[in-house]
Amino acid sequence: MPNLNESAKSKGVVIFATNTRETDYVAIAEQNARLVQHFLGLPTTIVSATDTGTNRRFSSDTGTFVEWNNFGRHEAYEASPYDETIILDADYLILDDSLDQLFQCPFDYLLFNGNHTIDGVYESNTMGPHSLPFVWATAVMFRHSEQTRMFFDLVARIKRNYDYYRLLYNVREGNYRNDYAFAIAHYILSGYRVARNTFAPHTITTFAGAIISIELRDGRVVVRSDQAYVLPMQSLHVMSKQYLTSPNLKEFVDQCLSTMPRKAS
């Protein structure tokens, strides 16, 4: 287990962003890096995975299936220049310091097994009717250690042999997902059980539908879609890529940086 009393350890964030024909994920990551610096006080490294492929995902903006390249999360262990790392999807907007506080916990790697979708879109908490509990790779925390290296090596093996592992663990969806590979690797590495001591104590908050705007008002986050949602100041997983690639995202980030307290580095 890592020594939490070591003061010389470096901390930082790795954001994975691989562009597609429809979406400039790197541009989204660059705006999120500004939020990371402001709310977490940490440096950011943006990584475009080398292990790529093509999946399709359903777009809440267009109601159609679009290209989705999200394969290389297993590269994070080698890609991170930090001793202690937060891995983020580009579209998980950091709006508080709760992730940084989790570094006070003892762990080799820390996963999120809970997701709260605020606009009522339901997603099962398992990977299939007779499969394992879901894990969200939207945010993952880890420290460099032998246990963590084994975990990411196992994720890479599952990715290479995904058709086999998908059938073995009764995964319903045909698309490869980092979420599924992380869940299976965690289950195997924990002795073929669901070890909850490596789960984060809080959930990821997601807005799954199309978004018109996001703004701050009186210290709260106001998301406008088909109706308005008023949220506490908290990090938010935004599925609307149309919003994230519009000028509205930069305007929202500018508002956050100019009105909310900055965390000391």
Label for each model-derived stretch:
Residues D96-G128:
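Conserved donor-nucleotide/metal-binding helix-loop-beta segment in metal-dependent transferases, i.e.
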Residues T85:
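Short aromatic/hydrophobic "clamp" motif used to bind/position activated sugar donors
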Residues M1-I15, V26, S131-A139, R143-S265:
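A glycosyltransferase accessory/donor-loop signature
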Residues D89-L93:
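The conserved acidic donor/metal-binding loop of glycosyltransferases
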